[in-house]
Amino acid sequence: MFRGKSLLCLLDFQTHEIEKMLEVSFLMKSYVYYNKVPNSLSGKRVALLFEKPSTRTRVSTELAVSLLGGIPIVLNKQDLQWSRGELIEDTGRVLGRVVNGIGARVLNHLTLVKLKESSGVPVFNLLSDLSHPLQALADLMTIRERFGNNLVKIAFVGDGSDNVLLSLMAIVAKLGLELHVATPKELKPRDDLYKIISEIAEDTGSVIEFHEDPYEAVRGVHVVYTDVWVSMGQENIAEQKKRMLQNYRVTADLMKYAVKDAIFMHCLPANRGEEVDPEVIDGSKSAVWDQAENRLYTTMAVFSLFI
């Protein structure tokens, strides 16, 4: 079903394929807990490329390859010759000769496309300016750990053009869930991608709505999610975005409008006092640390299925 394919965006996959990735993610978690991890990548080499700094993604991907019996080869920005002018396609061609898979955290999504087309091996999106599919899988895994397979309602509060939000929208649409996005009218997803997601949502019965009022978006939801207001590479518009989003902080008062057993989620890193108050992210409703841990298991699942 997956062997030899790449994972650049969840929109490229059918609902049953996403469900399979989640199913194997839960299996991987149990394998790790009981020290029975299969050697799915025995003898396999996986290149992990990082144009952007990384903590959770670096740890989860390198550890995933190692636990599955593979050999991780980590290259940071200063190690990549394309930062000195080499064609991305040339890097892809060379890596494709010596590794069995490539994971890449990149500034531009087109870099992933070029690696996929030139390398001939599975390529995995470890975060781009467009999306973060492994994060979305970990998000849904975390939600299901708390609420089972029930049709939960989710609210995202913050930047409506956020790459993490786009992957969340994609998986919500594919699985027929309900998502309410609280964001200023100036910050919306790309029209072309929102059109695709809306068409999928119509087919699956998913509900995705945008609100300017965060209290309206959060009312009655099971999950309240946020991300940083200023992503890496947006430093030149940082103050502008902070002004636009100053009324979109997740506070304890805002959480009261969700259901009683609602959880708070954040993909990290977090800026306490900016997009979320400390009492929320460090409080009893926070599922952030489970969410971060689950990044390992979804990565293990995807690598074992695709490589």
UniProtKB/Swiss-Prot annotation:
L-ornithine binds at residues 163, 227, 231-232. GO terms for molecular function: amino acid binding; ornithine carbamoyltransferase activity. Keywords: Amino-acid biosynthesis, Arginine biosynthesis, Cytoplasm, Transferase. Pathway: Amino-acid biosynthesis; L-arginine biosynthesis; L-arginine from L-ornithine and carbamoyl phosphate: step 1/3. Its EC number is 2.1.3.3. Carbamoyl phosphate binds at residues 54-58, 81, 105, 132-135, 266-269, 295. The record marks 29, 145 as: Important for structural integrity. It comes from the Archaea. It is an enzyme of class 2 (transferase). Belongs to the aspartate/ornithine carbamoyltransferase superfamily. OTCase family. Reversibly catalyzes the transfer of the carbamoyl group from carbamoyl phosphate (CP) to the N(epsilon) atom of ornithine (ORN) to produce L-citrulline. This is Ornithine carbamoyltransferase. The gene is argF.
